[in-house]
Amino acid sequence: MAAACICQPNLLEINVSDGPLDMIRKKRKIQQPQLRPPLRENKCQPHFSVRKVNQSYIISLHKEITCQLIAEIVKQKLSRIWEKVYIPSYELISDKDGNQIYVEQSVDENRLTSEIMEKLDPNNIDIEAIEILFDDYHLELSRLTNGIIISSANDHFYREFSFNNIIDDNFKICGTSMSADSFDKIYGVMWIEVPFNGNGLQNDSAVNRVSTSHNQIEELNDIEQEIRAFNISRSNQESIIKKEVSRRLNGR
């Protein structure tokens, strides 16, 4: 996967809404309801940032690729190819009473792990993980503001992004990639391109100031992030495959 479709652009100020703007609370002649505690943050929800690149806004969504997700993908794929990569061999030996029996020969687990890694291809596993993360994400043009709405039913995610420049309606997903933070967590990244025509709705001198979610992932160079994330993911995959190979060989 190539991460270089976006140069190092400036971050900018936008307006972000957590829910539909056309919901109006009606007055009711009943006692006031008790205050409820705030909803617990959904850890599946993505971090996001917005950048301006030439004549487009680029919205970046980041979601963590957990070891659990990688393990599920690896085990599924390994089940499909196991009988092709592992073909047991037997040696005919005689016991102390002269009886001939077949004994399964030992297997080089490291060699088998390397062969499986090559057949599964770490890149394909990363791509599948990112597809799963953003599988039900939906993009639509806002009817109330100059912006777009990004939502996900699975992640209970709803964000409305409104912009100062008048946008075109041909926004699209322009690519996916990976990134890594300083704690060696890896993230799937989805980029959404929102073109604008250059006409501003208002004179805003703060267009290049930062405005992102409070949990924004540390900003590093995109290509460096992807390379680092790939290396971490490859190490995680190899560890998972080794454990699964050992389990299958010793538990067969």
From Swiss-Prot:
GO terms for cellular component: nucleus. It is found in: Nucleus. The keyword Ribosomal protein does not apply. The keyword Cell cycle does not apply. Keywords: Nucleus, Transcription, Transcription regulation. One of its GO terms (molecular function) is protein-folding chaperone binding. Its main location: nucleus. GO terms for biological process: intracellular protein transport; protein folding; protein localization to nucleus. Involved in the curing of prion [URE3]. Nuclear localization of this protein may suggest a role in transcription regulation, so it might exert an effect on [URE3] through known prion-curing chaperones or BTN2. This is Curing of [URE3] protein 1. The gene is CUR1.
